[in-house]
Amino acid sequence: AACEPYIQQLCRMLNRMGARISGIASNLLTIEGVESLGGTEHTMLPDMIEVGSFIGMAAMNQSELTIRNVSYDNLGIIPAQFARMGIRFEQRGDDIYIPEQGHYSIESFIDGSIMTIADAPWPGLTPDLLSIFLVVATQAKGAVLIHQKMFESRLFFVDKLIDMGARIMLCD
């Protein structure tokens, strides 16, 4: 089973309603049937894809932005990956503040080799954000290898970016 925070929150909500689900936060859920479910109150997690998209948008537009109530602890490695792209931000409580930044530079490894960003099952990087990282990288100083491992053909829009002047090498 998927174990992203969204699945975890759904399982916890169902348990509060009377379900019997164990193995939450693992890749194996065990569900015991129950006669009925009751009601509960629940607050949905913010969409981590939207949060990542707004971080990328602020960086590319060199704009100051505060993203409120991001559920920072449930973003996994997303903030760290943006930091590796050279994007400065601050965690302010449960908000992310991105200051105006004239440019950003992709980190390289200590030996000078190119940084790699790759998608992976949770707690790895969600594949839905790879396209955001790719577009953000077109405006950065430096180089990055973006490796799409989980799905085929999701980055085939790069030919359009190349037509607009992006320096991208697509390997299949």
Where are the predicted features?
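Short, structured segments at the rim of ligand-binding sites
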Residues: 1-172
